Swiss-Prot record:
Signal peptide per UniProt: none
Pfam family name, one: ribosomal_L24
Gene name in the database record: rplX
Protein name per its UniProtKB record: Large ribosomal subunit protein uL24
A biological process term (GO) from this entry: translation
Originating species: Mycobacterium sp. (strain KMS)
C-alpha cells in the first residue's frame, strides 16, 4: 500500500471530499486508512462504572477507516499526487516519489 502512517492526505471522494488530514493508522490487509478528522462516526458504548464510582460510556465520536482509493497523498508543494517508487543509489532501498513533481516523499 502506497499510503503510510503519518502521511498528509486529501480525500478525493465521499462525504468528506476535499478534507485534508494526517493518516493515524494504516490497515494494509484491508486497504483502508484512518484519517484524522475525516469520516467521523458516533459509537454508542454501554455505560459502566469503575472502582471509584465514575461512569463512562454513552455516545463517543471517533474516526472510522476509509478506503485507500478515496485518498491521495499531498506532496511537498501541497498538491495531491500519485505515488511512484525509485531505488536510492546510495542505500539501495526503495523510496516513494511524487509523480507530480518528481521529489521524494
Amino acid at each position: 500500500m502506497k499510503v503510510h502512517k503519518g502521511d498528509t492526505v486529501l480525500v478525493v471522494s465521499g462525504k468528506d471530499k476535499g478534507a485534508k488530514g494526517k493518516v493515524i493508522q494504516a490497515y494494509p490487509t484491508r486497504n483502508k486508512v484512518l484519517v484524522e478528522g475525516v469520516n467521523r462516526i458516533k459509537k454508542h458504548t454501554a455505560v459502566s462504572s469503575n472502582e471509584r464510582g465514575a461512569s463512562s460510556g454513552g455516545i463517543v465520536t471517533q474516526e472510522a477507516p476509509i478506503h485507500v482509493s478515496n485518498v491521495m497523498v499531498v506532496d511537498s508543494d501541497g498538491n495531491p499526487t500519485r505515488i511512484g517508487y525509485r531505488v536510492d543509489e546510495e542505500t539501495g532501498k526503495k523510496v516513494r516519489v511524487s509523480k507530480r513533481n518528481g521529489k521524494d516523499i
